[in-house]
Curated annotation (Swiss-Prot):
Subunit-level organization: Component of the mitochondrial contact site and cristae organizing system (MICOS) complex, composed of at least MIC10, MIC12, MIC19, MIC26, MIC27 and MIC60. This complex was also known under the names MINOS or MitOS complex. Interacts with TOM22 and TOM40 in a MICOS-independent manner, resulting in coupling with the outer membrane. Interacts with MIA40, OM45 and POR1.
Protein's membrane topology: Single-pass membrane protein
Protein name from the UniProt record: MICOS complex subunit MIC60
GO-annotated biological processes: cristae formation; protein import into mitochondrial intermembrane space
Organism classification: Eukaryota, Fungi, Dikarya, Ascomycota, Saccharomycotina
Domain of life: Eukaryota
Annotated transmembrane regions: 38-57
Stretches in topological domain Mitochondrial matrix: 18-37
Alphabetic keyword roster: Coiled coil, Membrane, Mitochondrion, Mitochondrion inner membrane, Transit peptide, Transmembrane, Transmembrane helix
Subcellular location field: Mitochondrion inner membrane
Pfam families reported for this sequence: Mitofilin
């Protein structure tokens, strides 16, 4: 409809301006224009067809594709319509430029032909003076370019009115009609532009509002999310702190209540136990008093016999325990003797056996403990004693007697001090060590009493030329004879004589043999102490 109205308006305006520019008048009767009317009908029909096709194509895409593919010039018209429909101000700019150019041509034509009209004024039939009404269109909220177009047209109309042109009545009516049509078309265009602008503003406003609402919702959602996260974090921290504080307070209160209840329960249990003990004692006392005159008349005699029996059992138990301790002591001593005399063991450590002997000795000493009184019985066992209290208990006031240490404990102490943390060599190991001292013994036999480094070297060199004496030793006191006698004694396990021979040495030979003397003496001392323990245990 917009294209049709615009095209009609342009045609009418051209006709009116063309008749005005020529200045000719028609006095004869208006001829019929059948061919022109036919062309107008065809043009209007084609315009209506294309306009309807374009409008329906905007509403239906399938019809639009069919219309643009099968109707000539339809695709170009659709592109032009979409071009001006998206930017309606372009059409106003083009229309305004066309009108402005035509107005300039009209004014130039009027000016150029004014003299011709004056010369031919007598031959023209003047019917009416041209007087057009200005375009009274409300342009308060209209497009600025449309305002400019309406203002230019009003200036053109005022110029035509001021020129006082006389035209025939038919042309006057045609121009009047064209003016009315132009007013109507401009009013429609103004309303269309207002509506389009209003729709555009409403659409843009709705889009902006939608976009702002979306941004607001996103910001609101993000803010709510962050706020919720912060609040949850603060609530969790507050909850955790409050839980810890309350748990601590509850634990302290529970602990205090538990202590209070325990103390209260202990007091109640103590009071109840005291009451029960009193009641029990009272019941027992009553029953004893009742039974004492009946079946328990001989209770004291039975009690004395039971005491005698328990004493006999205690004495028997002590005797049995003592015998068992003696057996174990004998076994441990025999074990030590067998380990010391075993030549298959190069060295022996008897710390475990000593600890067992020590334990058995302490146990045996408890069985041999005497009473504190001279007659062998403790005063606490005597009846009718003056120290007897109300409850029948007797406090012994005898001075305690200190028993002298036994030979067994003394021997064990000596054995412990001799062998504690040290190893005892076998006879074969002692003999082998003595053979290892042969070279050093020969070197020491050649050294003077106060030898230096030179004397040491000289003795070492000359000792290489000495021979070790073996065989049946003589009673001589030279070093070779002593070495031979010691070796012979060790070979027959006569360790005592061998140690005496080595101890009798003096000077460097004695100093060379100090370590060997220490090991041999330890072996002799252990043997003697073990023999003492064996004899003492057999006498117990």
């Amino acid at each position: 409809m917009m294209l049709r109205t615009t095209a009609s308006r342009k045609i009418v305006l051209r006709r009116g301006l063309a008749s005005i520019n020529t200045g000719t008048t028609v006095a004869s009767k208006k001829a019929s224009h059948k061919f022109r009317n036919t062309l107008w009908t065809i043009a209007l029909s084609a315009t209506a067809f294309y306009a309807g096709g374009i409008i329906y194509s905007q509403k239906n895409d399938k019809f639009g594709d069919f219309f643009s593919n099968n109707v000539p010039f339809a695709e170009d018209l659709l592109e032009t319509y979409e071009h001006y429909h998206d930017r309606p101000t372009l059409f106003l700019e083009d229309s305004w430029d066309g009108l402005k150019a035509k107005s300039n041509d009209l004014l130039s034509g009027l000016t150029g032909s004014s003299q011709t009209r004056r010369s031919n004024r007598e031959n023209i039939e003047v019917k009416k003076i041209l007087s057009l009404e200005p375009l009274n269109i409300e342009t308060e909220n209209s497009d600025p370019q449309l305002k400019e177009i309406i203002g230019s047209l009003n200036d053109l109309i005022n110029s035509l009115n001021d020129s006082n042109l006389s035209i025939p009545e038919s042309e006057f009516n045609s121009i009047k009609k064209s003016n009315q049509n132009m007013l109507t078309n401009l009013s429609q265009l103004n309303e269309t532009l207002k509506e389009a602008l209003s729709n555009y503003m409403i659409q843009r406003t709705s889009e902006v509002i939608t976009e702002l609402n979306t941004q607001y919702e996103n910001s609101k959602r993000e803010f709510e999310k962050n706020l919720q996260k912060n609040l949850l974090q603060e609530v969790d921290e507050f909850k955790e702190n409050l839980t810890k504080q309350k748990d601590k307070e509850l634990e302290e209160k529970l602990k205090a209540n538990e202590e209070l209840l325990q103390a209260k329960h202990a007091n109640e249990v103590g009071l109840l136990s005291i009451t029960q003990v009193k009641e029990f004692n009272k019941i027992i006392k009553d029953k004893i008093e009742k039974e004492r005159n009946g079946r328990l008349a001989h209770l004291e005699e039975i009690n004395s016999e039971v005491n005698d029996l328990s004493k006999s059992i205690d004495r028997s138990s002590k005797i049995l325990s003592k015998n068992e301790a003696l057996v174990q002591l004998t076994f441990q001593v025999d074990e030590i003797k067998s380990r010391i005399n075993n030549n298959n063991l190069p060295d022996v450590n008897i710390d475990k056996e000593l600890s067992r002997l020590k334990l058995l000795s302490n146990l045996l000493s408890t069985f041999n403990k005497k009473s504190c009184c001279d007659d062998g019985d403790c005063c606490s066992c005597k009846k009718g004693n003056k120290n007897e209290g109300k409850e029948g208990k007797i406090s012994c006031k005898c001075k305690p007697k200190t028993n002298p240490p036994s030979l067994l404990s003394v021997a064990l102490d000596e054995l412990e001090s001799t062998c504690s943390g040290k190893k005892i060599l076998s006879n074969e190991q002692i003999y082998n060590r003595w053979n290892l001292l042969a070279d050093d013994f020969k070197t020491a036999s050649l050294l003077p009493p106060n030898s230096g480094i030179l004397g040491q070297l000289t003795a070492k060199v000359f000792s290489l030329f000495l021979f070790t004496k073996t065989g049946n030793p003589s009673n001589a006191t030279d070093f070779d004879s002593v070495y031979a006698r010691v070796g012979d004694n060790l070979r027959v396990s006569n360790l005592n004589d061998a140690v005496e021979e080595v101890v009798s040495l003096k000077g460097w030979p004695h100093k060379v043999c100090e370590s060997w003397i220490e090991d041999a003496r330890r072996k002799l001392e252990v043997q003697r102490l073990v023999e003492i323990l064996d004899c003492e245990i057999r006498t117990l």
